Each structure stands twice: as C-alpha cells, then as structure tokens.
A protein has these predicted regions:
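A short, charged, Gly/Pro-tolerant segment at domain boundaries
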Residues: 117-126
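Residue-level recognition of conserved structural "scaffold" positions that shape functional pockets
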Residues: 71-72, 93, 118
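Short Gly/Pro-enriched loop/turn and capping motifs at secondary-structure junctions
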Residues: 66-68, 90-91
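Generic secondary-structure signature for well-ordered alpha-helical cores
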Residues: 3, 7, 54-57, 101-112, ...
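Alpha/beta enzyme core
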Residues: 1-61, 67-85
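C-terminal helical cap(s) of enzyme catalytic domains, especially alpha/beta-barrels
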Residues: 20-34, 76, 88-113
Length: 126
C-alpha cells in the first residue's frame, strides 16, 4: 500500500444492514438498507485493524464503536495510530475531550511515556 502512494488507511466504517417488520413484511428502513455502526461493529473493526497492521507499515486510523477510553486503548493495541469517533459524538459531543485525562491516567499508571508505545503492542498466544 505504501509503495502505491498510501500514507495511511482508515478502518472501518459503517456496515450495511437491514431489518424487516415481521407483520407487514416491509423493511423498517425506507431505503431497505442502512448503516450499522456504533458498539455493534467494534469487534469487526478491531479484527480488521489487526489484519491490516499485520500486512502494511503505514499508520492506521481505527474507526468503529469507540465509546470510551478503554476502546481507544484496545484499538491502539491492535495497531491503530489514531482513532476516529462517530456515534459517540451524537450521544455526547464532549465525551472525546473527557477521554483524554483517562488516557493520560492509564499511561501514568502503566509507565507509558508516549501513548504511541501502545500502537501495535498486541501479544498473540503461542
């Protein structure tokens, strides 16, 4: 990817989903298909970031279901250099700013000098 000019990659965004009313048999979503996002996609997003990290050597922006500072740490451990928050901003636009102090406290408690030390620090089972 880097050889082709890619400076970074983001993963993932909303997944396509649908839902139907069992009584009317009509879609609950006017356009039939809609976006599935938020905490429901976090495990998929984490797996994709880890998969990408194992294949490329460029920064990865982790996206998908980040609702608290622990989610940020988890995305960084699997390889994200940065994160993007979507759904949470609709719930509480001030939440991302509040997470910074929690991240700082985590780093202090775990003797982490720079948060970037977390990026790709996963330990896989033998």
């Amino acid at each position: 990817m880097k050889d082709e000019g890619g400076d970074a990659v983001s993963a993932i965004n909303t997944l396509v989903g649908t839902s139907f009313n069992i009584n009317t048999r009509k879609p609950k979503i006017y356009n039939v298909f809609g976006g599935l996002s938020g905490p429901a996609i976090k495990p998929i997003a984490l797996a994709k970031v880890l998969e990408i990290k194992r294949k490329v050597d460029i920064p990865i922006i982790g996206i998908g279901g980040i609702m608290n500072w622990k989610d940020i740490i988890e995305f960084m451990i699997v390889g994200a250099s940065a994160i993007q928050i979507g759904t949470l901003n609709f719930i509480d636009p001030t939440a991302p700013a509040k997470m910074i102090s929690d991240l700082e406290n985590y780093c202090i408690e775990n003797n982490i000098q720079k948060i970037s030390e977390l990026t790709g620090s996963f330990i896989l089972p033998n």
